[in-house]
């Protein structure tokens, strides 16, 4: 083995060892989410929210593959007849945040839903979608008042990141738009949460 290829092997091995030490998903019951491609994480979110609606007896039709348009369409489906865009993110190991790519025209659907998956729980956030003006304004997000929506170069796609602590904080406000799932959360709690927000 040449000195150069040996150096590359050693560098890859060192990075792999760091990665193994940082594996926050190692003991998670849904640890396979960490190995999925980003678009498949999105499909997990869509199918999971559809499943929650079915378990709750809430009318829903969700299949983002049939509603997509370049730059963003009218959402991934409908819940209670209302259009909903669903964004699913997993907690990053090196960057402890949930990163949501919102597309170029995220204001088209009536509602936005974030499913933020952590190793030991998940957060479901649903809110009436923002207007085009709100997305472009650089003002704080009304449902996450310490954050702003990122609009890349004022012409591309929009992005919004949350964190575990931010979700916990927002779940504690009165009439919260964020729900924390734990082992004790019942399907009735989820049903009441969805029905309270999507009207």
Predicted regions and their residues:
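Nucleic-acid endonuclease domains
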Residues: 1-82, 87-199
């Amino acid at each position: 083995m040449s000195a150069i290829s040996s150096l590359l092997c050693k560098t890859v091995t060192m990075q792999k060892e760091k990665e193994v030490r940082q594996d926050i998903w190692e003991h998670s019951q849904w640890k396979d989410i960490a190995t999925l491609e980003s678009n498949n994480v999105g499909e997990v979110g869509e199918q999971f929210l559809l499943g929650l609606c079915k378990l709750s007896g809430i009318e829903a039709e969700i299949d983002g593959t049939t509603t997509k348009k370049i730059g963003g369409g009218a959402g991934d489906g409908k819940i209670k007849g209302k259009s909903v865009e669903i964004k699913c993110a997993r907690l990053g190991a090196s960057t402890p945040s949930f990163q949501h790519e919102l597309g170029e025209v995220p204001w088209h659907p009536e509602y936005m839903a974030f499913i933020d998956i952590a190793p030991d729980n998940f957060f479901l956030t649903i809110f009436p979608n923002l207007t085009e003006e709100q997305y472009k304004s650089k003002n704080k997000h009304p449902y996450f008042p310490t954050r702003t929506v990122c609009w890349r170069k004022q012409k591309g796609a929009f992005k919004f990141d949350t964190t575990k602590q931010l979700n916990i904080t927002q779940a504690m406000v009165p009439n919260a738009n964020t729900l924390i799932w734990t082992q004790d959360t019942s399907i009735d709690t989820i049903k009441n949460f969805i029905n309270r927000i999507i009207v």
